Swiss-Prot record:
Chief subcellular location: cytoplasm
Region of interest: Small ATPAse domain (RuvB-S): 202-273
Protein family (similarity comment): Belongs to the RuvB family.
GO CC annotation, single: Holliday junction resolvase complex
Region feature (Head domain (RuvB-H)): 276-352
GO biological process, one term: DNA recombination
Function according to Swiss-Prot or TrEMBL: The RuvA-RuvB-RuvC complex processes Holliday junction (HJ) DNA during genetic recombination and DNA repair, while the RuvA-RuvB complex plays an important role in the rescue of blocked DNA replication forks via replication fork reversal (RFR). RuvA specifically binds to HJ cruciform DNA, conferring on it an open structure. The RuvB hexamer acts as an ATP-dependent pump, pulling dsDNA into and through the RuvAB complex. RuvB forms 2 homohexamers on either side of HJ DNA bound by 1 or 2 RuvA tetramers; 4 subunits per hexamer contact DNA at a time.
Residues binding Mg(2+): 86
Protein name stated in the entry: Holliday junction branch migration complex subunit RuvB
Length: 352
């Protein structure tokens, strides 16, 4: 089984200093080339921690495809960044014993780019497209017949010399990953036979992921230390591993040790202005802005202007976790603090 990757999509890598948040689930530049992220990737469903229902469903579909000696149905995976969509896609290729070609939608700029990818596929191979909701319309329309009938309908020439040509394709599997399911057009979405939402991970699952990764990078963490780190990882493995690496840096530089205690975790994260709820300065600034308005509902654009941030960043990066832990609520008139949010920001503003 081989994995062939296209050029990396740099558009999802935050550029400015203020965007490089440790608790942001988007991948950051150094993680694109960090070999540790590849070390920790499981190579079978058995090694993959969490998402039990999805694994069970995929295992049945894969075994059925093998039994019939057919390609797996086209599969769509969606959910927040950092939950393992790419890892699951690669695991499917391992389980199917198929070659997987990896591409990012923003790098597929022209129709001929997707044509080249499709023509390069062989029987039973897998094409994985990350951020598939960002495909342009012309490219997306070429996928309709490719997915449904395994053929490409191309128009060659122009004006009176134009002619249609149909190219048959081998039976392949398209796996799409997206953080924005609603942004995928209905015709494309309906052509996926399997569609799964990747859920946030429990603290116990994150604890096991942290423990496994700490062994791989020669760190000694006891159960309590793993549990402490899991609780502030926002249910996201990518954040958990990123925080663990920053704790490792602190322990090795400041304490000259590879043994991680709860005390070291607290001091390391405190140096990064991350508290025991996993919130950083951006989160606290968001909550403080709501409090300053006497808890009257505020529109997202007004909050973004007041904070000097983009409204889309606040909506898709900051808000989901604050809503998940019950600190803010969305109303028809805007955002406002809950009683938990008021209590938190009142007790933490002095410290930070």
């Amino acid at each position: 089984m081989a994995i062939i990757s296209s050029s990396l999509d740099e558009s999802n890598i935050p550029r400015s200093r203020k965007e490089l948040r440790l608790v942001d689930s988007k991948i950051i530049a150094d993680e694109k080339i960090n070999k540790n992220l590849n070390i920790v990737r499981p190579t079978s469903f058995k090694e993959f921690i969490g998402q039990e229902q999805i694994k069970s469903s995929l295992k049945i579909a894969i075994d059925a495809s093998k039994y019939r000696k057919e390609a797996l149905e086209h599969t769509l995976l969606y959910g927040q960044p950092g939950l393992g969509k790419t890892t699951l896609a690669l695991l499917i290729s391992y389980e199917m014993n198929s070659k997987c070609r990896v591409a990012s939608a923003p790098s597929i700029e022209r129709p001929r780019d997707i044509v080249g990818l499709l023509l390069g596929l062989k029987e039973g191979e897998i094409l994985f497209i990350d951020e598939i909701h960002r495909l342009n319309k012309l490219t997306e329309e070429l996928l309709y017949s490719a997915m449904e009938d395994f053929r490409l309908d191309l128009t060659m020439g122009a004006n009176r010399g134009a002619r249609c040509r149909t190219i048959n394709l081998p039976k392949f599997t398209l796996i799409g990953a997206t953080t924005k399911l609603a942004s995928i057009s209905a015709p494309l979405r309906d052509r996926f036979g399997l569609c799964h939402k990747i859920e946030f991970y429990s603290n116990d699952e994150l604890k096991q992921i942290i423990f496994n990764f700490s062994n791989l990078i020669n760190l000694q963490l006891d159960s309590d230390a793993c549990c402490s780190l899991a609780k502030i990882s926002r249910g996201t493995p990518r954040i958990a591993l990123r925080l663990l690496k920053r704790v490792r840096d602190y322990a090795q530089v400041m304490k000259k040790t590879n043994k991680i205690s709860i005390e070291i975790i607290e001091k390391a994260l405190d140096s990064q202005k991350i508290d025991n709820r996993g919130l950083d300065n951006v989160d606290r600034k968001f909550l403080s802005f709501l409090k300053l308005n006497n808890n009257n509902p505020i529109g997202l654009d007004s909050i973004a202007a007041g904070m000097g941030e983009e409204s889309s960043m606040l909506e898709f990066v900051v808000e989901p976790y604050l809503i998940q832990i019950g600190f803010i609520m969305r109303t028809p008139r805007g955002r406002k603090l809950t009683s938990l949010g008021k209590k938190y920001i009142s007790s933490n503003n002095e410290k930070y």
